[in-house]
């Protein structure tokens, strides 16, 4: 029997205040308010397609720019994911997903290995998507990988930047959903720990 895989994490700095409440075995419910509409949209998509119950409340120095808020939300979400997974007994651990969205195609492969690493092939034409700098889309993925201690390979192609980013976050959601799925009772590593 699996215990509830849930975590609540808070991150407070001079730049941001972030609170994340994550339940891995959820139904896709979300309540997200980061002050950045596009980031909210992406996180709601992660919750919906990852079947995660997710609450995010963030206040950041948006008068400076979006960087600190995007980064700290990703760091806090990653910490919550890592904590909620515990010792990772029984999880599938590795997964991938490919998501089309009109002209865009995104692929994400990840490993909840305990070893953070990212390989990204993301190109956006516009400097800003909604209210988020396009360079911070990749930075979100990198920050999430570091704090969740997971390996993420992600690529996206297409013409419309909104479609590319949204396909990326949906692929991330589906890969997480598959990787956290419980398949057996053992820790999925020849080392005996992750």
Swiss-Prot record:
Annotated protein name in UniProt: Imidazoleglycerol-phosphate dehydratase
Gene Ontology CC annotations of this record: cytoplasm
Keywords carried by this UniProt record: Amino-acid biosynthesis, Cytoplasm, Histidine biosynthesis, Lyase
Molecular functions (GO terms): imidazoleglycerol-phosphate dehydratase activity
Transmembrane regions listed in the UniProt entry: none
Keyword hit for Nucleus: no
Subcellular location: Cytoplasm
One GO BP annotation of this record: L-histidine biosynthetic process
Pfam families linked to this entry: IGPD (PF00475)
Pathway: Amino-acid biosynthesis; L-histidine biosynthesis; L-histidine from 5-phospho-alpha-D-ribose 1-diphosphate: step 6/9
Organism: Methanothermobacter thermautotrophicus (strain ATCC 29096 / DSM 1053 / JCM 10044 / NBRC 100330 / Delta H)
Signal peptide, first to last residue: none
């Amino acid at each position: 029997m699996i215990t509830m895989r849930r975590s609540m994490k808070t991150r407070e700095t001079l730049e941001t205040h972030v609170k994340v409440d994550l339940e891995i075995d959820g139904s896709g419910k979300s309540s997200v308010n980061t002050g950045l509409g596009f980031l909210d949209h992406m996180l709601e998509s992660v919750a919906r397609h990852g079947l995660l119950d997710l609450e995010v409340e963030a206040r950041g120095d948006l008068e400076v720019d979006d960087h600190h808020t995007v980064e700290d939300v990703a760091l806090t979400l990653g910490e919550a994911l890592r904590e909620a997974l515990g010792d990772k007994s029984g999880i599938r651990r590795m997964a991938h997903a490919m998501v089309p969205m009109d002209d865009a195609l995104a692929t994400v492969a990840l490993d909840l290995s305990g070893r953070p690493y990212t390989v990204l092939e993301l190109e956006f034409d516009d400097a800003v998507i909604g209210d988020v700098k396009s360079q911070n889309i990749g930075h979100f993925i990198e920050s999430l990988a570091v704090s969740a201690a997971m390996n993420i390979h992600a690529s996206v192609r297409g013409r419309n930047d909104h479609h590319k980013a949204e396909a990326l976050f949906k692929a991330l959601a589906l890969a997480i959903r598959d990787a956290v799925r419980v398949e057996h009772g053992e820790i999925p590593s020849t080392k005996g720990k992750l």
